[in-house]
Amino acid sequence: MALERTFSIIKPNAVANNNIGAIYARFESAGFKIIAAKMLHLTKEQAEGFYAEHKGRPFFDGLVEFMTSGPIMVQVLEGENAVQRHRDIMGATNPDNALAGTLRADFADSFTANAVHGSDAVESAQREIAYFFAADEIFPRS
C-alpha cells in the first residue's frame, strides 16, 4: 500500500455542533496522522474557487452559501491508501445512504450539511491541499 495524503473539511454544521474532536478521534483511530489543520471562515470567493468544478450546477449556490455560513476545519491526513480510506470513513455523500458508523451517518444534518468533505482522488487531494495550505504549513510526522 502507498502512503498518501488526502484533504478533508469538517463542514460548518459539524463545527457548530462541536463535533471536531469526535471526528479527529475517528481519523486518528483509523490510523491517519493529521499533518496540517486550521480553522477558517470561507469567503464567498474562496468557496466559489474551491468548488469551481460545480459552477453552473443546480446545487452550486446553496453549497457556497452553506460553506460560508460558519467556520470550517481544513486538514491534511496522511496514511496508507488515505484517499479511499478517508472516503470509506466519511460514508455516502447522501447521509440517508451512509452506512452506520460512518462520519456522515453520525454527524450529518442533511444532504448539503453532510458534515465532511474529502478528496476523491490523489490528484484532487494535491490540488485541494495546495488551495488551503502552503508547503511550510504541512508537518509530516514519523
From Swiss-Prot:
Major localization listed first in the record, in broad terms: cytoplasm
Catalytic activity entry: a 2'-deoxyribonucleoside 5'-diphosphate + ATP = a 2'-deoxyribonucleoside 5'-triphosphate + ADP; a ribonucleoside 5'-diphosphate + ATP = a ribonucleoside 5'-triphosphate + ADP
Positions with a binding annotation for ATP: 11, 59, 87, 93, 104, 114
UniProt keyword list: ATP-binding, Cytoplasm, Kinase, Magnesium, Metal-binding, Nucleotide metabolism, Nucleotide-binding, Phosphoprotein, Transferase
E.C. designation(s): 2.7.4.6
Gene3D superfamilies linked: Nucleoside diphosphate kinase-like domain
Needed cofactors: Mg(2+)
One GO process term, biological-process aspect: GTP biosynthetic process
CDD domains membership: NDPk_I (cd04413)
Molecular function GO terms recorded: ATP binding; metal ion binding; nucleoside diphosphate kinase activity
GO cellular component term, pick one: cytoplasm
Subcellular location: Cytoplasm
InterPro entries: NDK-like_dom, NDK-like_dom_sf, Nucleoside_diP_kinase, Nucleoside_diP_kinase_AS
Pfam family, one: NDK
Active site: 117 (pros-phosphohistidine intermediate)
Biological role stated in the UniProt entry: Major role in the synthesis of nucleoside triphosphates other than ATP. The ATP gamma phosphate is transferred to the NDP beta phosphate via a ping-pong mechanism, using a phosphorylated active-site intermediate.
Sequence similarity: Belongs to the NDK family.
Quaternary data: Homotetramer.
The protein's name: Nucleoside diphosphate kinase
Natural source organism: Yersinia pseudotuberculosis serotype IB (strain PB1/+)
Gene: ndk
